[in-house]
Every structure is written in C-alpha cells, then in structure tokens.
Amino acid sequence: MRNLKLFLCMILLLTGCSYKTLNEAVQHKWKEPVKILYIENKKQTVIFTDGPTDVQYVFSTFEKEHGRYKYSTDPEEGYTFDSEVGVPFLIRTINREKVGNIIWGALKTNIKVVRVNVVYTNKNNPDDQIEVQIPVKNNVFIGYPTSSFFDSETSLFQEWNLSAKAYDEDGNVVANINI
C-alpha cells in the first residue's frame, strides 16, 4: 500500500496539475466561470471571456501533454474594449517566448465575421508591408505572421503602422482599425 501511495505521489509530481479538458484547466485558475471562444492547438494558444458578462477577453497559452492540459495565468493578457463609433474591434500584437509573434483580437458584433486582414506598413519605407490573413471563429482570432519582425509591442509600433479590416461571409467590411 505504501508503495502504491509513493507511486501515485511521484506521478502527480511528474505530471503536475493537469486536466482532461482545457476548459477544466483554465477554470481551475479562475474564480468566475469562463467561456472558451477559440483554441489554437498548433501553438497552444487560447482566447476566452470571463464568464457571464463576457466583458473581458483573455489571451494566453497552455500546454497539452499526453492528452492532458496544463494552464498558467502567467503570461495572461486580458482586455475590455468598446467603441463610440462603429463595431468595437480589439487587436493586439505581442511576442511570446516559445510562440513568437502573435496577432490576436475580437470584435463585438452580431454579424458573423469570417476573416481579418492585418497589414503592417513600415514607417520609414511604406513599400515594405507585411500582410496577414487570419480566419475568425466566434468573432475572435489568433494569427501568426510568417516571419518574426518585432520583439515587443513597443518596438513594433516604433517601426510599423497597423491597419486591419474584418470581413463577413459575403466579403463586406464589417469593421476596420488603424493604429
């Protein structure tokens, strides 16, 4: 019996606190109920909202090993957003260790958004542009530029302007943003 307890303790220590579903892993870290809106398995990133109010949109990473999920609130990013004019459109461009450059965001609209096109234009050379087309699910998105071109959000906006357009199923522009 003692050997069995020792074996179980070693398994727990080696695997850490892992869960059968990502929802269970995230919920374990949050007091409020969360609603997962988008899971990107290739680079193990996720976007969710903070429960019944869906006010705060949160982006983070997770780990999946042996069919089990681990989630840490470090380095979580959460934002609330609104707009006085047009469709509220959140777009964030960040760099994460082990993942690289990431573009993520959300739109608050009843219109089904299917794609976001993001264009970065170099401030010193306007002909130098990087365009990223990102599929949208549940009006949220996670995308990755094909090449790494910044180290931090601060350095990005010192060198690049950002513009983005969100499109519906018919190809109509639902929202746009220029930063």
Task: Pin down the residues of each PLM region.
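Long, terminal "pre-/pro-" and other extracytoplasmic accessory regions
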Residues: N101, A106-L107, V118-K123
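Ser/Thr-rich low-complexity repeats and stalk/linker segments
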Residues: R115-I179
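N-terminal export/targeting and maturation segments
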Residues: S18-S83, E159, V174-N176
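Short amphipathic beta-strand and strand-loop transition segments with alternating hydrophobic
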Residues: P33-Y38, L90-N95, E131
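Short proline/glycine-enriched turn/loop motifs at strand-loop junctions of beta-rich domains
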Residues: K108-V114
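Short, surface-exposed coil-to-beta transition loops
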Residues: D54-F59, V99-I102, D128-Q129, W160
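Sec-dependent bacterial lipoprotein signal peptides
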Residues: M1-T15
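Extracellular ectodomain segments of secreted/surface proteins
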Residues: G78-I103
